[in-house]
Amino acid sequence: MFRVQRLRMFSTSRALYAGQNMTEKIVQRHAVGLPEGKTVVSGDYVSIKPAHCMSHDNSWPVALKFMGLGASTIKNPRQVVNTLDHDVQNKSEKNLTKYKNIENFAKKHGIDFYPAGRGIGHQIMIEEGYAFPLTMTVASDSHSNTYGGIGALGTPIVRTDAAAIWATGQTWWQIPPVAQVELKGELPAGISGKDIIVALCGVFNQDQVLNHAIEFTGDSLDKIPIDYRLTIANMTTEWGALSGLFPVDNVLLDFYRNRLTKVGNNHPRINEARINELQAKSDSLQADPDAKYAKKLIIDLSTLTHYVSGPNSVKISSTVDDLSKQDIKVNKAYLVSCTNSRLSDLESAANVVCPSGDINQVHKVAEGVEFYIAAASSEVEAEARATGAWQKLLNAGCLPLPAGCGPCIGLGTGLLEEGQVGISATNRNFKGRMGSKDALAYLASPSVVAASAILGKIGSPAEVLGTKDPNFTGVVATVEDAPATSADGKDVADESGASGSVEILEGFPSEISGELVLCDADNINTDGIYPGKYTYQDDVPKETMAKVCMENYDPDFQTKANPGDILISGFNFGTGSSREQAATAILAKGIKLVVSGSFGNIFFRNSINNALLTLEIPALINMLRDRYKDAPKELTRRTGWFLKWDVSQAKVYVTEGSVNGPIVLEQKVGELGKNLQEIIVKGGLESWVKSQL
C-alpha cells in the first residue's frame, strides 16, 4: 500500500534565491569555455571536461568511431578507462578477437585497462578511485548513475560522446532539472538499499523524476551505508533519472578511510592527501541553503518493508508478504550485477542460507531452482571467500559465475527460459532482458532473493529464519512540485545564473522561429520517427529520409509538416533504440527544432550530436492539449501558434496567428553557450571533433 501526498511548493524566482545545488556546483567545476562570471544552472547547455570516461565491451565500437573521426591520439589517456565486463563468459573467436582489439588499443594509447574477470566496470571505477566524490565521471553505459553513491556526479553518455572525449577531452551536457529526494525516518532492521529504491520506483511511478538529476538528502543519511547508497544510485536509472547524487558526509569519509587501509597510501587516486582535501572542501561543494530544486519528493523509511519489483516492470512494486501469499514458484534466482553483488550483498544472502554461522549447516536451494551468484569484482569475490560468505552460498547449492554482468544483460549461462520465473538482485526486469520474452522477472534485495531460492517461491527471509517482519501499514510519501510558469503563462523560472545576454557565434542564428506542428502523443519511439526497416540501410538518400520521417507514427505527417516548421510533441519523445537516423530524418525534413514535454535521453543526445536543436517546454504541450481537448483527434496538427526562441536572451515566446501575434506563453530556457553553438554550426559533434584535430 502506498500513500502519496501531493503538495505545491511556494514558487519564487531565483533572482531572489541565488544558491546552487550540488549538481550545479560539480558541473561548474567541470564546465569549460564559460563566459566570465557565468554561474551554471539547470537548463544550461555546457561543454564539460569530465574527470574520467569509462567504456566497457563497447570500447571497440567507440575506438572505431574515434578512428573514423580521423583521430590518432587520445587527448588525455589518464581520463579514459577501458573495462571488459559484459560478455565475459563468451569464449568465441569473435568475442575474444574484440576483447584483444580493445586491450591492444588501450596499450597502444596508454589507457588504463582492466581485463575480463577483474569485474564490472562501475565497481572498478569505485574501487580504483576513478569515480571520486565531487567530481564528474561519465561512461558509455546507462548505469553510470551508480557513482552518485559515493558523491560523484555520474551520468551516461553515448558512443559519439565517448569518442569525442577520447579525441578532445570534452563533450557537452545540458544540466537537467534537479529533484531533491528526502529520506527521513529510521530504516527497519533487515530492510536494505534495494528495498528503498524499489519502493521509490513503485511509489513515484508517474515519471516524476524522468530526465532529472536527483540529490538525496534527509536525516536518514547518517545510517545509510555506502553499499546501500550505491544500489540506490544505480537504480535511479530505472527510475528515469540521469543521475542520483548523495552528499559527502562522515559516512562517506569513513568509507574512504577504510578503503585506504586496503589499497595503501601509495594508490594514485585513493590516498590520505586526497581524502584530507575532500574533507576540507566538502562543505563548500554541498548544496547551498537557498539552492533551487524543480521538485521535492519525501519518503519515510520507517514505513518500508521488503519490496519486490515486477513482473517485468520496475514501476510495479509489491510487498514480499503480498507476493508470498500468491505462492509464485521460482525457477531461477540471481545475485549478480553492479547493483547488488558487493561484499555486504553476498553476506546478506549468506546470512539467510546460513543463519547459524556454521558453514556446514546451511539451508539448501530448493529442488528445481537454480541460484546463480557472481561478485561485482574479483576483489569482492576474494573478500567474500575470506569471510566465508562465498563458501556458505556454494554449500547451499549456488552456482558461481565469473565477476561480470552476465545474466543481468542476458548473456552467458543461466538465462530465463520460456515460461520460467526468475527473481534477481539486478536492476532491470524488462521483458526479455534476462532471457525469454515469455518469462517473468522480479527484482528484490539479496536477502529476499536468497530466501526465495530456498523456499522455491517468492518469499521473505523471515519465512526461512522463523522470525517476523515488522508490521506494515503502507509507505508514507510526499511530492512537492514547483510550477515552471505562473497562471498567466509568464515565466517564474530560475534566472539567477543568467548572464543577461548570450553571446552568439558567427554563423549561428540569434533567433529561431516557426509554426508549431503538433504530434499529440507521449512516448513516440524512434521506430515511429524513422522506421526500423531503413535503419541498417546505409545508402538511404536524404530525400527518402525526409519522406519516411514520422511514417510509422502518422503517414499524413508528410503532407502536414513543412520545412521550417517546429515539431512539438508530448512527453518522452524519442524513446526506444539508439538509431541516430531518428534525429537526422527530422533534419532531412527541414525541421531544425523539436519541442517536447521531455525527451528520451539517447534521442536527446543524438539530436545535438547531429545538429538538431531541442527544447523541453512541458507547459507548452499542456497548453496545446488543453486547447484541443474537445477537437477531433488528429495525429498531426498545424496549430497556428508560432514559437520564437530568442537565443541571445535564452527565452521563448509563443504567439498566435503569426510570429508577431499576441503572446500566449513566455518562458526562460537554458542558455545555449558558444561551445554548443559551435557544435551546431559545424554540423554536429563528429564534425566539431574533426575541426579540433
Swiss-Prot record:
Record-listed E.C. numbers: 4.2.1.36
Catalytic reactions of this protein: (2R,3S)-homoisocitrate = cis-homoaconitate + H2O
Primary localization: mitochondrion
Entry keyword set: Amino-acid biosynthesis, Iron, Iron-sulfur, Lyase, Lysine biosynthesis, Metal-binding, Mitochondrion, Transit peptide
Superkingdom in the source lineage: Eukaryota
Statement: the UniProt record of this protein carries the keyword Mitochondrion: yes
Pathway noted in the entry: Amino-acid biosynthesis; L-lysine biosynthesis via AAA pathway; L-alpha-aminoadipate from 2-oxoglutarate: step 3/5
Pfam families xrefs: Aconitase, Aconitase_C
Subcellular location: Mitochondrion
Stated family: Belongs to the aconitase/IPM isomerase family.
Function description: Catalyzes the reversible hydration of cis-homoaconitate to (2R,3S)-homoisocitrate, a step in the alpha-aminoadipate pathway for lysine biosynthesis.
Protein name per its UniProtKB record: Homoaconitase, mitochondrial
Organism annotation: Kluyveromyces lactis (strain ATCC 8585 / CBS 2359 / DSM 70799 / NBRC 1267 / NRRL Y-1140 / WM37)
Gene from which the chain derives: LYS4
